């Protein structure tokens, strides 16, 4: 049984978001003994219990208040919200933050030998999908009538099997579509993982834990998006060097021993440092340029 004073968080047991969700909690310093054969895993160092379930069960568990938090793809979340609206069921929740993984898109695709010139090319055809509500919402806005073929898996084989004329499915790289003789023609919905909470009263103790967890999650994501930069630069080019590096704060500038014309500069850059930027830094006279990953960060 769950202890009512502990935070309950629903996570995908296996699949696309499972390992990234576990990695996120681990990076936040939460020690959870995760065993895939178990439904519930308990944190050793924080009052947090993880419920390991199917991804399409997570929105309902949060909306119904069975768990306090959930990590789920926005595509699954929105599909369940639309489904519940159609059934006049409880569908409220709060998005605490979007996460930096599970990035994909829900797209329409047709066989490569099919003529497609405009969204109107999809009128009155049969479309296979696992996301009927998202598909209907999108095509209704375009005033496109269609026939839906609901499939819970292997959607990409539907045209070859004669079940549908087109599909609406998740796409990451497009390799699966290509392997099945399909081409992407229209993006329906863009998605990534998000952290959600139930929409209702949460006691003070739980709020404190959730706030602490949120601070850590934001710190982990910020660290992933940032790099620690160290370099030597000419004093007379310092402002030009700084202008190339986008940071939350001004850099630390230190004197170099035995060199009055150059300084050492340290800063956290909030953007990915590309080779082109490094080449521009070098052209300004910067040297000993080091770009280091950041494990944890708190502003």
Curated annotation (Swiss-Prot):
Q: How is its activity regulated?
A: Feedback inhibited by histidine.
The alphabetized list of GO BP terms reads: L-histidine biosynthetic process
Predominant location category:
cytoplasm
User: What does the record give as the organism's lineage?
Assistant: Bacteria, Pseudomonadati, Pseudomonadota, Gammaproteobacteria, Enterobacterales
Gene that encodes it:
hisG
| Involved pathway(s) | Amino-acid biosynthesis; L-histidine biosynthesis; L-histidine from 5-phospho-alpha-D-ribose 1-diphosphate: step 1/9
Similarity section: Belongs to the ATP phosphoribosyltransferase family. Long subfamily.
One Gene Ontology cellular component term attached to this UniProt record is: cytoplasm
What is the name attached to this protein's record? ATP phosphoribosyltransferase
Question: What SUPFAM superfamilies does the database record attribute to this sequence?
Answer: GlnB-like (SSF54913), Periplasmic binding protein-like II (SSF53850)
Q: Which UniProt keywords apply?
A: Amino-acid biosynthesis, ATP-binding, Cytoplasm, Glycosyltransferase, Histidine biosynthesis, Magnesium, Metal-binding, Nucleotide-binding, Transferase
Keyword Lipid metabolism listed = no
* Top EC class, one word: transferase
Q: Which organism is it from?
A: Buchnera aphidicola subsp. Diuraphis noxia
Gene3D superfamilies the UniProt entry points to: 3.30.70.120, Periplasmic binding protein-like II
Task: Return the InterPro entries for the record.
Answer: ATP-PRT_HisG_long, ATP_PRibTrfase_cat, ATP_PRibTrfase_CS, ATP_PRibTrfase_HisG, HisG_C, N-reg_PII-like_a/b, N-reg_PII/ATP_PRibTrfase_C
Q: Specify one Pfam family.
A: HisG
């Amino acid at each position: 049984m769950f202890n009512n004073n502990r935070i309950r968080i629903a996570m995908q047991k296996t699949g696309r978001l499972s390992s990234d969700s576990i990695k996120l909690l681990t990076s936040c310093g939460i020690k959870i003994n995760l065993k895939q054969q178990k439904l519930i895993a308990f944190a050793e160092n924080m009052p947090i219990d993880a419920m390991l379930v199917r991804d399409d069960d997570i929105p309902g568990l949060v909306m119904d208040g069975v768990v306090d938090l959930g990590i789920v793809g926005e595509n699954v979340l929105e599909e369940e919200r639309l489904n519940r609206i159609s059934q006049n069921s409880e569908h409220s929740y709060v998005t605490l933050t979007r996460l930096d993984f599970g990035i994909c898109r829900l797209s329409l695709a047709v066989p490569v030998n099919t003529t497609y010139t405009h969204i109107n090319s999809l009128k009155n055809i049969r479309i296979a999908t696992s996301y009927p509500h998202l598909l209907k919402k999108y095509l209704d806005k375009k005033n496109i009538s269609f026939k839906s073929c609901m499939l819970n898996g292997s959607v990409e084989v539907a045209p070859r099997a004669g079940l549908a004329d087109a599909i609406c499915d998740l796409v990451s790289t497009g390799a699966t579509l290509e392997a099945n003789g399909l081409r992407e023609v229209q993006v329906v919905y863009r998605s990534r993982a998000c952290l959600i909470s139930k929409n209702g009263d949460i006691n003070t103790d739980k709020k404190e834990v959730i706030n602490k967890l949120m601070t850590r999650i934001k710190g982990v994501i910020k660290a992933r998006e940032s790099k620690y930069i160290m370099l030597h630069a000419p004093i007379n080019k310092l402002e030009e060097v700084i202008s190339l590096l986008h940071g939350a704060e001004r850099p630390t500038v230190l004197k170099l021993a035995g060199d009055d014309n150059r300084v050492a500069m340290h800063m956290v850059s909030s953007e990915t440092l590309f080779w082109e930027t490094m080449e521009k830094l070098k052209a300004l006279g910067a040297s000993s340029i080091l770009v280091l990953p950041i494990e944890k960060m708190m502003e």
